[in-house]
Amino acid sequence: MKRTPHLLAIQSHVVFGHAGNSAAVFPMQRVGVNVWPLNTVQFSNHTQYGQWAGEVLAPQQIPELVEGIAAIGELGNCDAVLSGYLGSAAQGRAILSGVARIKAVNPKALYLCDPVMGHPEKGCSVPAEVSDFLLDEAVAMADFLCPNQLELDSFCGRKPQSLFDCLGMARSLLDKGPRAVLVKHLDYPGKLVDGFEMLLVTADGSWHLRRPLLAFPRQPVGVGDLTSGLFLARVLLGDSLVAAFEFTAAAVHEVLLETQACASYELELVRAQDRIAHPRVRFEATPIGF
């Protein structure tokens, strides 16, 4: 029997709705990965509602929880770590400590960093110390980096002038350590307004993917978290990076179609679960170069 992968997901959690782990854990489980959720915050709901209740996990608790898993002899079974929203740079350093601990007992373990800073339509949402930490420390340890356009701009200190400029910016991040950069949401002058575009960049090649842009009265939250989680899950299940990229785009589109059909502000993950596991649509990633 083929072994089921195990993944430690360290990011935010909401009681109501879908953001952070609340957007990523169930879909990753649904495609066949055992997920160990470690919630960096627990809020009543995501912050785009304008009000919420809850608390942030103290940074020192992250390595304590990792050591608790080690104490029962299970840490070596962790195949990957996913990190998302950070409340502080101290919390980020605690996560990197956990990643290092896991890689020490399982050198093959992967680390995907979703460098959450904000959304292009909503602005930056983290303190400057978090942005600095992500660029100066997290990127170097990440096997996979999954920024959106705002985060790519922040890393590179400028906005792109074209699709090929986005490609060059993403490639520049490879020099800092990651084996692959997945840009979850491209935005550049001349981009077609009816398309949603993504980019996958590795040392061996680069691929561009375009899918239809679906209209919503209010953009659902958690799409980036869903994207990063599914991409890492599919890699753990044996997909090539390109195949994982294509699968992720299709599965996320299926969720958005169901969400749109239900006129819902929150992602309709449960209703779309079969199509997450078995997308009906397919979007081809096209090789791209200078």
UniProtKB/Swiss-Prot annotation:
For binding substrate, which residues are annotated in this chain's numbering?
12, 47-48, 225
UniProt record similarity statement: Belongs to the pyridoxine kinase family. PdxY subfamily.
NCBIfam families with a match to the protein in the record: PRK05756.1, pyridox_kin
The record's section on InterPro entries has: PM/HMP-P_kinase-1, PyrdxlKinase, Pyridoxal_kinase_PdxY, Ribokinase-like
Q: In which pathway does it act?
A: Cofactor metabolism; pyridoxal 5'-phosphate salvage; pyridoxal 5'-phosphate from pyridoxal: step 1/1
Key word Transferase present in the record?
Answer: yes
Q: Which gene encodes it?
A: pdxY
- At the top level, the lineage of the source is Bacteria
Q: Where does ATP bind?
A: 114, 151, 184, 211-214
Biological function: Pyridoxal kinase involved in the salvage pathway of pyridoxal 5'-phosphate (PLP). Catalyzes the phosphorylation of pyridoxal to PLP.
Q: Which reaction does it catalyse?
A: pyridoxal + ATP = pyridoxal 5'-phosphate + ADP + H(+)
Cellular component terms per the entry's GO annotation: cytosol
What would be an example GO MF term here?
A: pyridoxal kinase activity
Q: Which keywords does the record carry?
A: ATP-binding, Kinase, Magnesium, Nucleotide-binding, Transferase
Subunit structure as annotated in this protein's UniProt entry: Homodimer.
Q: List, separated by semicolons, the cofactors it needs.
A: Mg(2+)
Biological processes, Gene Ontology terms: pyridoxal 5'-phosphate salvage
What EC identifiers does the entry list?
Answer: 2.7.1.35
Know the name of this protein? Pyridoxal kinase PdxY
